[in-house]
Amino acid sequence: TEDPIVIAGGPCATANPEPLADFIDIFVIGEAEPILDELVNQLIDYKKVKRNTEVFADIDGVYVSQSLNAVKRVWTQNLDETMHPVAQQVPIVDDSSPFMTIFGRTLAVEETRGCSRSCRFCLLRHINFPMRERSLKKVESIIVEGMRNTHVSKVSLIGASIFDYSHLEDVCEYIVFHGYELSIPS
């Protein structure tokens, strides 16, 4: 049988991929959106012609432990231009079920990425800078389409530094005005 290619990303992989290098073939350093198309195309080519995983190291933001290439962290500069899920899975279990997700029956909407603070102890500040925001217009359109597709009554605002979002009050008013419940998780 053929071994699958194992890909990892996220805060821990971005901060220090080496401890998992024996188990992971490819690490995405930073955010996947800017390189997702290129990575998927390379995976398709890789499946057709078996090669060494080092070919992935030529993609910005991809770390392959066997490669000696320096890795540049990739990040989305304009959140308005990047995709956001507008049809989210909602558990079909009782609210008291241990299988209910932490956010429950809600539409999770990301307003910000990164953080404007410079806390020395915070991993997120160092790997996910600079802070970026979605425009109010974009957030509203995500909510409209997401609520239509997801069939829930609650919107959760997601962001590492959500209270620094310049349109927080406006988006909260928008959600409440349209009769939805509002959640701002810590």
Predicted features, each with a name:
Residues 143-186:
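Conserved SAM/AdoMet-binding glycine-rich loop
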Residues 25, 115, 139, 184:
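Conserved, mostly hydrophobic/aromatic
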Residues 100-137:
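Canonical Radical SAM [4Fe-4S] cluster-binding loop centered on the CxxxCxxC motif
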Residues 59, 79, 104-108, 116, ...:
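Active-site lining segments that contact anionic ligands and/or coordinate catalytic metals
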Residues 14-16, 35-37, 91, 116-120, ...:
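Flexible loop/turn segments at secondary-structure boundaries
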Residues 95-99, 132-144, 148:
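Ferredoxin-type iron-sulfur electron-transfer modules in oxidoreductases and energy-metabolism complexes
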Residues 65-108:
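N-terminal [4Fe-4S]-dependent radical SAM core
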Residues 1-70:
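Glycine-rich beta-alpha loop elements in corrinoid/cobalamin-binding modules
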